[in-house]
């Protein structure tokens, strides 16, 4: 075993979505957890997202600067039951990764709360970003670089690049490792690996991953 992935919910409830902090009471001593993992010569990467719940510090700071989008994203509901109960919307919103100040804020919380305790890499989920029940007006959402309609496909490039550039500026002692759900041309320069999305566990699906990966690589 070389690597372990810490999936979502280490932050607690959906209203604290992607707080970039170990707020779940099950994680009483995250630093010791990292030390124990490293003591067994393993590494850990952690799930981080493009959206923030309304009770998080990143949300409040980004909201003050008008650096959050208003379209619907994941999680849709504050309730953790399935299907989503829209009587209790989560209020989660996607951050403007095109904005340099927003990328600074995003990294600040990664660095202070996650990298500082020994996280080795980043599992960047929802880097498309997730956009549910779209309406035409959503694509007119203003970003730092123009309308969302014009720059939407480059979102993963900007979000992943922001994490890479900031980590490189902080230290060169550890290589940057990023696993991202989405990509854009040129993203390989950011030390980013891409997976083929949310799939099921079957031999048939595994078989399809091989040509998918080869074609993805050939496309650059």
Language-model features, listed with the residues they occupy:
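Catalytic-domain carbohydrate-binding cleft regions of carbohydrate-active enzymes
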Residues: 1-220
